[in-house]
Every structure is written in structure tokens, then in C-alpha cells.
Amino acid sequence: MAKIAQGAMYRGSVHDFADFDANQDAEALYTAMKGFGSDKESILELITSRSNKQRQEICQSYKSLYGKDLIADLKYELTGKFERLIVNLMRPLAYCDAKEIKDAISGIGTDEKCLIEILASRTNEQIHQLVAAYKDAYERDLESDIIGDTSGHFQKMLVVLLQGTRENDDVVSEDLVQQDVQDLYEAGELKWGTDEAQFIYILGNRSKQHLRLVFDEYLKTTGKPIEASIRGELSGDFEKLMLAVVKCIRSTPEYFAERLFKAMKGLGTRDNTLIRIMVSRSELDMLDIREIFRTKYEKSLYSMIKNDTSGEYKKALLKLCGGDDDAAGQFFPEAAQVAYQMWELSAVSRVELKGTVRAANDFNPDADAKGLRKAMKGIGTDEATIIDIITQRSNVQRQQIRQTFKSHFGRDLMADLKSEISGDLARLILGLMMPPAHYDAKQLKKAMEGAGTDEKALIEILATRTNAEIRAINEAYKEDYHKSLEDALSSDTSGHFKRILISLATGNREEGGENRDQAQEDAQVAAEILEIADTPSGDKTSLETRFMTVLCTRSYPHLRRVFQEFIKKTNYDIEHVIKKEMSGDVKDAFVAIVQSVKNKPLFFADKLYKSMKGAGTDEKTLTRVMVSRSEIDLLNIRREFIEKYDKSPHQAIEGDTSGDFMKALLALCGGED
């Protein structure tokens, strides 16, 4: 069993088996594998119920009793994923890691994700044991093999981590914290090009406690989390490795919770990753991983494994997991405090928003107007030229092109485009040609037209736009449709949902900072309306109105403080509780507001992902997000997308769309991450 620090609580899910008898277990395993077929149920039940130390004793007893190698017999009797899981459990952790790394660097291609996961997350002691195990098992030097299979700064950082010389957590120097912040800042943000050596030295050698202080101070000094600077300054596998190191320094269990979620979400399961983590963390921090998983993803690790795997493989994984946290229906106080700390950090964070479309240099509206006219004249249409010009100009420049087109040719550019292109490409190009407020106004109008209302589009636009954007939309709606937006919303929606939309459509959200006393009162209102407060006060209708007022009119910085106070007061995350306690369009509207306040680029990254996953593509949502965010924060959205879904929007668009529509979307996307 893993060594526990003195006074520390054991957080593994697998314990030493009481009344353990190695000979008896060896006999039971021999019996389970004897004859025709094997008793897989008995094998998994026994092996998942013993600690790693006890399993090593069973291996020894098996050899003494039968003169045979237990692992070799298990490999012979079992197959597939179940065999890989059971065999991994039978190896000492260091040898298990050594085998994973050997597999990662053998053959054609390298499994960089496996190398990153193991070397970024292990302690000094675990690294030393791994190096020794690799030498013992393969009679080769691990460092030499890593050097032979990797290159560049990625290789250098792996070699640094392989030394296992990170300072102990009691090594913290306040003066050095400031110096490291300055060195990292100068090596990245302030330098033309990046001094990767500074990042490697500081992140590869300083103690975890010291680096946590460095990260906090870096955020205060630069207004950016260290992760944002790493994404901006580094690239490729080196960037992924450094981000993994930062995540493990902040919270190793959270890093593994994310890895497990990504291993099981979407089509297909990454079984090697799932097995590696469940085996390696079962006697270290599985309970912490479960807590964070439950809070972060609103489902238990147990339930996700249950739904994503099958057979004996599933049963063995569930035994290692050790319990279903959904059964209790509660969020863990420890995990809630992680969320609280996240809000504490976000309070001082100033993330720079960046679009992917910028004003073109050497802009010539005359040449662009002529280029577009030529592309649409005669037989056939030159879609490539249309896409190239329109996606590479800012919206202000496009309006100048429209005016120049009319002055030169006496023709309406929008009308010509409508007659020459069609379908999804037409919707995208025409959307780009409209001023943003008029585009949003049109999207709102279309959402309320005909039979049925597109509530999701109404929510997406009204919950995410700034006051200035909302006011411009109101003016554009009145100008284009000769009716106020409020009247349109009133006639097309009803009840509490209507009141929320009208409140958002006034564009009267406060724009100041936070008020701590008011935030505590607002958090209490939220706790009462969501029925988790100890002492509810006031009638429900009044509370509903106050809750709506809080979410629809308070400033973003203030709401972040409210959400933080809500966690402190209840040990719940407000978004999770809204999803659990509310329903329908009201729930969707409030969740959208909360998500937008928490992280607007992530909100839109989720929208993009959902528009392209599964059968069929939601082209309307995909187009709306790409058009409306291209000059605001699409670069930030790209980063959130790849962070959460492990693939880039560029890859998703390539895989889910085609033809000229795809080309135009990729041009707006602005690059492959």
C-alpha cells in the first residue's frame, strides 16, 4: 500500500484485506484458472479486494506453490481490456508505470499523452522507483530511451522531470516567489520569442507549495493565470506538458478527474488511459478524484464508468472506484471549497479577450468591391474569392465595402450575394455582412417567427451581450422591424421566462465592482429560492423576483462574489443547484447567465461543441456563434474548446461540415491549435 504521510488521512479506495492469507488466495486463483474456461468473477473479486503489496505476496506464493508465474497465467486465461486491467493491478506501481512508458515509446509513433500524464504527476520518490523499475525490467536506461524518442523543449522538460529533484514542500522563499514571477513574465509576455529554459527550470524544480504561491502572485501581477501565458507562449506537446505540470501542482486529483472524464466522454472510450489512472490512483487519491469529479461534472465517476463500460471489465473498474457518490446526492464540502478558491482567483483575473478576425492591413474598399463584383459576374460564381475577401475583413471594413459597391455599381451587395450563393454558406456570408446589432436583431426575430419559438437562441443572445450591445440591438430591432424588441418578446413568450428575457433586454445590468455585504444578501436569496437555506424568509413569489433581479441586473464581478458566497454558505455550486431544482426555459436562462458570468468563452465553446456533436449539425447555432464572436473572443473560445474537449474547433469543423461552408468557417476560426 502507498506510504501515507504522518497524520494524513488515507484517500485511496482499495485497502489491505483483513485476515489476508497469500497461500489461500494463490490457491483460489489457481482453481479459478484450472480446467476449461476461467472463473473471471472470482479473479476480479479477489484481485480488486487486495492491496498492491498483498498482490505481490500472492504472486510469490503462487510461484512457490505451483512453480508458475501468476501474471503469465492471467495473461493466458484472460483477454482484451479486462486482461490489461488485471495484469496492471498485479504489477508493483513502479513496474506498471515502466511498462506504460515502454509501450508509449515502442514501435511507430509515440504516445505523448501517456508520457505527459505519468511524468507530470508522480512524486520524486515515485519517479526514482520508476527509473529503477525500468532498468530492472528492460535492462535499459529510461532517460536515454526518452531522449531517443522525443525532441526539443518537450524532451528537455521530460528529462528534468525524470531527475525527480523537485524541492520539498517545506522549501518556500517569499523573495524567490517574486523573482520567479518576474522571471516567468520576462521569459514569456515581455520577450519577443519565449525563453523556454526559464519555464523549464522554474516549473520543473520548485516545490509545489512554492509554485502555488508563484501562480497566485503571477495572476495578481499580470492579470493572467499562468495557464493563459503558457498557451500564448508555448506550443505543441511542450505546451501540453507544461499545462499538465501546472494542473498537477494546483491539484493532482483534479488533473486526474479531468483525464478520466475525457477518457470516457464522446464516442468510444480511451481504455488505456482509464485503466492506467484507475490502477495507479486506487491506493493514493481515488476518493479525492471522485469528489472533484462529482462536483465538476455533475455525475459520479461510478455512474460514468457504469454507463461507458461493460462485462467483467466494468465490474473490476467499479470495484476500484469504490462507491457511487450519486447515491448520497450531496456535493462534497472539500470539492465545494475547490470551487470557492477558483472564484477567489477569478476575482483578480483579467483575461484579455481576442477575436480571430481583425481589420485587414492595406485595406482598399474599392479593390474589394471590384473583386466581389467580378466574382459574381457572368456564368458561375467564384465562391473562393467571396470567402477570402469577406472573412478577412473586419465588420467595419465590410460596411465600407457595401457602400463602395453601391457607389461604383449602383447595386446592393447584399442582394447580389443572396442571388449568387445559397444554403449554409449564404447564411454565414450574409451574417458577416450585417452590422453586429442588426445581425443579432435578425437572429432574435427569426427565433420568434413562425410556429414555435427557438428559446435557446433567445437565451444565448440576451444572456451574453453587454449593456452597450443590448441597447444597439434594441435600436436595430426597432429600425428593421418597426416594433420594439420588448413587445416582440412579450407577445412570443410567457410567464417567468418572459420576465427574465425582458429584464435582460433592457440592457440595465450594473457595471461596477462587487459589494461584499450585498453579495451575502444576494447569496441568501439564492439559497432560499433554491430551497437549500436553513431559514427561508418571505413568500416565494417575492423571492423569485429578487432572484431574477440578482441574476439579471447585478454586475459580473458582483455575481462572481455572489456565487462564491453561495458556496461558502451552502457547500453547493449555484449552477448545479439551478439545474437540479429548476426546469424548462427558466432553468436554461438562469444556467446560461451563470455560465456566462463564470466564463463566457467556455459558454460559447460548449455551444460550438454541441452544435457539431452527434448525428447531424446544428448549422444555425454554429453560424451564429462563429459570426457573432469572430471579432470579440473567438480566440479565447478556441482555447476553452481544446482544453475541455481535447480537440480543436478547426478539427471539429473539418469533421462535421464540408465544401465552401467549411472553408468559410475555417477562415473565421483563424487557425489550427
UniProtKB/Swiss-Prot annotation:
Cellular compartment(s): Cytoplasm; Melanosome
InterPro entries: Annexin, Annexin_repeat, Annexin_repeat_CS, Annexin_sf, ANX6
Modified residues (N-acetylalanine): A2
Residue positions where Phosphotyrosine is found in the record: Y30, Y201
Pfam families: Annexin (PF00191)
This protein's GO CC annotations: apical plasma membrane; cytoplasm; intercalated disc; late endosome membrane; lysosomal membrane; melanosome; membrane; mitochondrion
Keyword Coiled coil: no
Modified residues annotated as N6-acetyllysine in this record: K63, K68, K75, K81, K306, K370, K418, K483, K620
Classification via Gene3D superfamilies: Annexin
Cytoplasm in keyword set: yes
GO biological process, one term: regulation of muscle contraction
Function per UniProt: May associate with CD21. May regulate the release of Ca(2+) from intracellular stores.
Other notes: Seems to bind one calcium ion with high affinity.
Family that this chain belongs to: Belongs to the annexin family.
Protein name: Annexin A6
